[in-house]
Amino acid sequence: RLIITCTMMVILGYSTYSMIFIRAQQNPKINYNNPEDIQSAYQYINRDQYGQWSILDRETSMVINSQGNNESWKRYTKNPKKVTQEEVTEFVWNYQFKEMYLRYFAWQFIGKEGWNERSWTRNSLDGAPLMSMRPLQGVDIWRYGLPLAFIIGLFGIFYHFKRDPKRALSVLTLFILTGLAIVVYLNQSDPQPRERDYAYVGSFFAFAIWIGIGSYGLISEIKQKFNFNSKIVALILLISMPMMMGFKDWYEHDRSNRYEAWDYAYNLLNSCEPNGILFTNGDNDTFPLWYMQEVE
C-alpha cells in the first residue's frame, strides 16, 4: 500500500507537466521548443537547448566564463588553467553554498540588507587569500529587530526531533533535497544572470514548517512552565513575526509605479524599423518584449 501511494504521488507531481504539452498542441504564439510530441517533450524536460554540464566538475564551473572580457574567475583563482584544490573548495563554499544558498535563506528568515544588492568585492590577487571566510553580504540580522522567524525555526527543529524524530527526519530530508542538494546538482558558475532564490523555495517551505512547530512548542512550554495564557502567547507570535516583516519589506516588494521593464521593452520595440528583426541577449531581455508585443 505504501509503495502504491508513493508511486501515485510521484505520478501526481509529474502530471503538472501535462499542462505544457496541452498548451503546445494549441500552437500559441509563444511556444518554447514546441513540445507537442514525445521527442520534443523529452528534449524540453531535459533542457537540451542549454547544453550539457557536469554535476561534479567544480573546477569547470569556476572558469567556464573566463572567455572574452569576463574576468569573474579572478574571484577564485590566479590561473584558470591551473586551479588548486584549495581554490575549488573555497569556490564551492563561498560562492555556491554561501552566496547562492545561505544568503537567500537568510533573506527569508533573518533579513535582507536594502533594495540595492551589491556583489562582494574581489580580494587582491597578490598576498591576501583569494577568498576569505567573509560573513554573508546583503544580510541585515537586525532588520526585524530580532530574527524571530529564524530563532523559532531553530527551536522548532529541536522540538520536532525531540517529540517526533521520524517525521522530523522526513522534513529534514525535504529541507536538504530542496536546498543544499540542489546547490550540488546545479553546480552554478559565476556570474548568474539573475538571483536564484526561487530555486530553493522547497527548503524555505520546509523551514517554515519548523517555524510553525516551534511556535506550537514555545506556546506549550510557556503554558506548562509558567501557567501563562497560551492564547496571548499565540497572538503575540502571530502578530510580531508577519507584521514586522510586512512593515519592513512592503516597500521593497511593492511593484506599483515601477515601469523600468515596461519602458525598456517599449523603447526597444520602437527603435525597430517595420518588420525588423531584433536580436536579444537571452530571456531576461526577451520576456518584457514578448509581454509588450503580445499583451499590450
Indicate where each model-derived feature is located.
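Lumenal/periplasmic acceptor-binding loop at the mouth of the active site in multi-pass
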Residues: 24-158
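Soluble catalytic regions of membrane-associated enzymes that act on cell-envelope
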Residues: 56-100, 248-296
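Hydrophobic/aromatic-rich transmembrane helices and adjacent perimembrane loops
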Residues: 180, 192-217
